[in-house]
């Protein structure tokens, strides 16, 4: 397998708190990896380090052989990494189509001035963005809402739109932060199908998720964090039976344990 992502010794402090403690992770092209652990384990902090919202204090993150730790988010997006957020970050008073087009703007070359002046290249790129956005809305199953404001969509459809927006930048690695949060069982199954279809499009996926049915159902490997430390890594069947994981996470929550 070809490794496209590597984190070595990633450490992050917030004051006197060590939120991440020398976390190592290698991701191979085409994998679906789940990152699990109790609340406060450092999962979102790790995502934030990868996507450039914060910089690690120690260690290094590389993608496709290039160091990306410490880069600004827009530069990391240009390298081919995109993400969603647990708390949806959509433009409420923009249409679903426009939200996805914004997601793809990082791939354009015209720039803001060209867009304002409506240069020929800007018009061509806008047409390309619109066509790409329509295809992605069809892919996630909400193309009929393309002209609706994001705030008027149902919660489940806003979740789908968030994924379409992230796909708009044409990523090689997609980070999904609790994509199943708040979804009903039917929507959750549809999400699982969608994630495997995303992988089939050649996109590697790293997921933070608490729903063990999702984790165990679609993951190639599972990584477990606890208090900022990676305590386990393995196949879903291995993680499910790991006594350290059961003690630290699965065994703490009756609902989680039953779902697993």
Residue ranges and their predicted role:
Residues 1-260:
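Glycine-rich phosphate-binding loops of nucleotide-dependent enzymes
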């Amino acid at each position: 397998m070809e490794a496209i992502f590597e984190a070595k010794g990633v450490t992050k402090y917030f004051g006197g708190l060590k939120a991440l403690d020398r976390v190592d992770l290698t991701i191979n092209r085409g994998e679906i990896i789940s990152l699990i652990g109790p609340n406060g384990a450092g999962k979102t902090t790790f995502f934030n380090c990868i996507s450039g919202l914060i910089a690690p204090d120690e260690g290094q993150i590389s993608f496709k052989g290039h160091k990306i730790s410490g880069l600004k988010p827009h530069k990391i997006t240009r390298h081919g990494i995109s993400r969603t957020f647990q708390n949806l970050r959509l433009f409420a008073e923009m249409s679903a189509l426009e939200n996805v087009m914004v997601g793809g703007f990082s791939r354009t070359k015209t720039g803001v001035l060209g867009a304002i002046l409506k240069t020929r290249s800007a018009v061509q790129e806008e047409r390309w963005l619109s066509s790409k956005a329509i295809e992605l809305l069809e892919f996630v199953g909400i193309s009929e809402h393309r002209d609706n404001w994001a705030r008027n969509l149902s919660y489940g459809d806003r979740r789908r739109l968030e994924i379409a927006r992230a796909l708009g930048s044409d990523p090689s690695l997609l980070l999904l932060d609790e994509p199943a949060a708040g979804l009903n069982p039917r929507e959750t199954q549809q999400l699982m199908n969608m994630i495997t279809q995303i992988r089939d499009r050649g996109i590697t996926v790293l997921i933070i998720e608490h729903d063990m049915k999702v984790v165990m159902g679609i993951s190639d490997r599972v990584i477990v964090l606890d208090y900022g430390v990676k305590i386990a890594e393995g196949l879903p069947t291995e993680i499910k039976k790991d006594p350290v994981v059961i003690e630290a996470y699965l065994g703490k929550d009756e609902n989680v344990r039953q779902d697993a």
